[in-house]
Design a protein with these regions (language model features):
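Hydrophobic alpha-helical segments
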Residues: 1-3, 115-117, 164, 210, ...
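Short alpha-helical hairpin
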Residues: 8-33, 51, 174-185
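Alpha-helical bundle segments that constitute or directly flank the non-heme di-iron/ferroxidase center
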Residues: 12-17, 32-61, 81, 130-140, ...
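Amphipathic, well-ordered alpha-helical segments in soluble domains
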Residues: 19-20, 47-54, 81-85, 108-112, ...
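A non-catalytic, amphipathic alpha-helix used as a structural packing/dimerization or gating element
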Residues: 39, 43-50, 73, 77, ...
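Active-site-proximal alpha-helical scaffolds that flank and shape metal-associated catalytic sites
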Residues: 66-170, 199
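Acidic, carboxylate-rich catalytic segments that either coordinate divalent cations
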Residues: 194-224
Length: 224
């Protein structure tokens, strides 16, 4: 069994819980509140900047030239997507540049970006790869499910198209292939660290979407 298959099977419970979140179900049906989606877009833009930086560190740690190119390009794309959010979704949902810049990271976003940043700088290349993989892979699988269940004229169709398109899925398959290639060289201790990093990333994917649906800032301090 490929290492990626082991990752998926070990964490299938988290994927199913993520898929079942009201945010994703209502997004597919076009009934998600604009406020919840706007909250998500702002936090996703903050997240993507940190994700891009983590990808750049991953590229610097890569073993082979092809991997350096792969993750350098992925880092660039993360920033391009972050900027496109300003020009498309934020404009569509009346989120001004000032509102975005004045909105701090939520607890979920802060936790996720801090985990990725700390892992990128302090862990080995294989572990960094495993930590970054959930964002690629879970988004791709959720995107496919949403396409299968989406209504016609969905107000969130542009977002659905972004994460369900063939270009994104090709990139995801390439990252999975790199993870398998690198994992094949790793000892048992490193593989377990990769499993732990992937599971934490998968947990934080769930938390990010759940937090967006609840429009939660800092749990317990939202009204302080």
């Amino acid at each position: 069994m490929l290492f990626s298959e082991q990752l998926w099977q070990r964490n299938l419970d988290l994927y199913q819980k993520t898929l079942a979140l009201p945010f994703n179900q209502e997004l597919a049906q076009g009934t998600l509140s604009p406020e919840a989606f706007g909250h998500y877009v702002i936090q996703d833009a903050h997240y993507l900047l940190a994700y891009g930086r983590a990808l750049a560190v991953c590229a610097a740690k890569a073993y082979e030239a092809d991997d350096v190119m792969q993750f350098s390009e992925a880092a660039k794309i993360a920033i391009v997507v972050e900027r496109s959010l300003h020009d498309s979704f934020m404009q569509q949902f009346d989120i001004s540049k000032q509102e975005f810049e004045s909105t701090p990271l939520t607890l979920a976003c802060h936790h996720y970006t801090s985990f990725l940043t700390a892992t990128a700088w302090s862990e080995s290349y294989p572990v960094v790869l495993a930590a970054l993989l959930p964002c690629f892979w879970i988004y791709a699988e959720v995107g496919k499910d949403i396409v299968d269940n989406s209504i016609a004229n969905n107000p969130y169709q542009a977002w659905i198209d972004t994460y369900s398109g063939e270009e994104f899925h090709t990139a995801v398959r390439n990252v999975i292939a790199t993870v398998n290639k690198v994992a094949a060289r790793c000892d048992a201790d490193t593989l377990e660290k990769m499993h732990a990093a992937y599971r934490m990333g998968a947990k934080l994917e769930w938390l990010f979407w759940d937090s967006a649906y609840q429009q939660r800032q800092w749990h317990g301090l939202d009204h302080a």
